[in-house]
Amino acid sequence: MGLKILHSADWHLDSPFAGFDDSQRALLRQEQLSIPGKTAQLCRREKCDLLLLAGDIFDGEPARETVEVLKKALSECGARVFITPGNHDFCAPGSLWLEERWPENVHVFTRGLEAVTIPELNCRVYGAGYQSMDSPPLLESFRAEGSEKYRIAVLHGDPTRKDSPYCPITAQQVRDSGLQYLALGHIHKAGAFHAGGTLCWVSV
């Protein structure tokens, strides 16, 4: 049985849209608020098994309406959802990631690197949430464990700079990870590369 994944990141919901006038900001906010629903529709249409959201879903502290829009969309997407908070929406005490009651199909990674096993999909998903506005290199000395057919990680990290304060990730770390798929967010530029047996995708 194959595994179908939808991977996205960096929605920055409730961005202030600085530099735009009021009417432009209203239009941009309306368009931005449609992202969760459109993503859920795509997930259902494609019959995805997993929805991976690799950080910065919110730009900062979101409005109540925005949180409810996201929760509703995720509850209706028809997939298991894994979210890793990023540097803009990091998981600190009092964070909505900790305080909100998320739908049953949603798992938010709220601390250091951890794994969730899904036996019915023969899959193990790793992830970690930012605790502050920066993150150490989480894949340093990391090696995926378990006998599952699919070993996946979702992280908010930077594969372009070894000295990045935002979870720097090197090709060697990816190669040594033992993962089949690494889902990244952060750099706002889509792309992919193979390192060993791992496919690494950076999503926007």
Which residue stretches match the model-derived regions?
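N-terminal active-site segment of His-dependent metallophosphoesterases
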Residues: 1-69, 147
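His/Asp/Glu-rich metal-coordinating catalytic cores
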Residues: 50, 60-204
